[in-house]
Every structure is written in structure tokens, then in C-alpha cells.
């Protein structure tokens, strides 16, 4: 069985065509960095040609612990970049179905923000980037969802929770999967991130768990972020998380809907359109290598 290894800002994935297996178990084995290939997640994809799905392809993403994610921004960029180069596609635009809806992606070249934001140093900025319409974020407590009473229709902004390191204020946003965004004066030491990440991920407030982002506001268009991903732990980048960060920063008055998000693995440009309220993510995706699995891995 052939596979591709790709990454988006160091958030790495194994891409495989759908072949009807126990994917949660396979993801745990293949993503293991000591006894498997090693990755943050497993992406399974298939063509929608002979289906009733109104998209070109569909994808499912499994985290390294075997859990399934609704959507992954870095993974969909990787898949789009791979499909555009290797499969029969209609130009550089694709519609990819996910469990969080159909996402429209586009391969872009000579990306220019007309001087609005300096993206110098973006990984892959001199090559093709991938633009993804991430659709509208969900902000109401009932939509994310949160385990709260009486205020299910409120915007979940600056909600306090108590932790071993004191009180942190969360702004919750769903950009497919749920995210808890926390604004801090300084980014966390690694030891603190490794302890706080799982505490917030599994907090009773989130019935299905949550991704966690710690954010330092450098300027109105520059946000530095640390990521703790639900089901994967500390990672170098999170695309849906970068989108959630810009939404949270906007509703809290830190930016105006457009910013680049600096993650440990590199930068993403995020635009939350004022007119349509839709989110757009632009960033790189890189092919690492191709490989073939020994059939014994399936038994």
C-alpha cells in the first residue's frame, strides 16, 4: 500500500487512498514516531466521482491517538497540494469534503497582499501556497459546543477557568473542531504548556475535548501562538487553530480580522472577511517522501 508523507509548517501527515481498513487503529500504529512512520495524523482520501457528494474528493483525518478530527487546516493544504500535482484535477481549484463540510481550496502563486502585511520569511512563500475557504466560524456556546447552562446562545469570550497555574481566560471558537484561545503576556515555558495543554483539552467545559492555543499579541497583524492539539498533543502548527486565533483576536479587539499567525513551524496568513464572515487561510504544504507499506502492518 503506497503512502505519501507531507507536512504543513511541520504539522506532518501520512496520506493514503481509502482502502477500507480500521483507520483508528492504523493511525495509532503508523503515526508512532518510534515504531511506525511517525506523524501527527493520518489522512485518508478518495475521489467523489462516483458518489452523490458534490465535491472532487473527500478526506478523513485521524489523530495520532486514533481519534477522528472534524477538520484539519494543515492536512487539507497538504492533500490539495498533492492532488493538484498528481491526480486528474480541474486546474488548481478543488472542492474537498470533510466531516466539517465541503472546503474549497486553491493553489495560488505570486501571492501578494498589496503591502498590507509583510509575509517575508513565510515557509514556502516563494513557491505555490494553498488557499482554503474555511467558511464561517461558530461562536455561540451551543454550536461549539460547550457544557454550559443558561447562556447557550452567548459568544464564548474570556470565560475564566481555574488551573494549577492560576486563572486563565478562554475565548472559544469552532473552525470545524473546537478551540480554546488564551491570550497571554508571554508564551509559556514548555513544561507549563505540556501540563496545561491536556488539563484544558479535557476540561469539563468541553464535552468532546478541545484544541488549545496560547497567544501573544505582537501587533494588530502579528500573533505568536503555541499549540496543544486535541488527540495529538504539542504540535508545530494548527491551521484551524490559526483561524480560531484570528477570530478570537478580532472579537477581543486585538486585530481587525487580518493577520499572520506565527507558529513554531512557520507562518500562516488568515483573513476573516468582514462582509461574508468567512475565513480564509493561506499557507504552504510540502512533500517529504513517498513510500510503500509492508502488508504485515495490517495484520
Swiss-Prot record:
Pfam families associated with the record: DAP_epimerase
Molecular-function annotations in GO: diaminopimelate epimerase activity
Location in or out of the cell: Cytoplasm
Parts forming coiled coils: none
A GO biological-process term: lysine biosynthetic process via diaminopimelate
Reaction catalysed by this enzyme: (2S,6S)-2,6-diaminopimelate = meso-2,6-diaminopimelate
Keyword Cytoplasm: yes
Major subcellular location class: cytoplasm
NCBIfam families in the record: DapF
Subunit-structure text: Homodimer.
Protein name: Diaminopimelate epimerase
Organism name: Natranaerobius thermophilus (strain ATCC BAA-1301 / DSM 18059 / JW/NM-WN-LF)
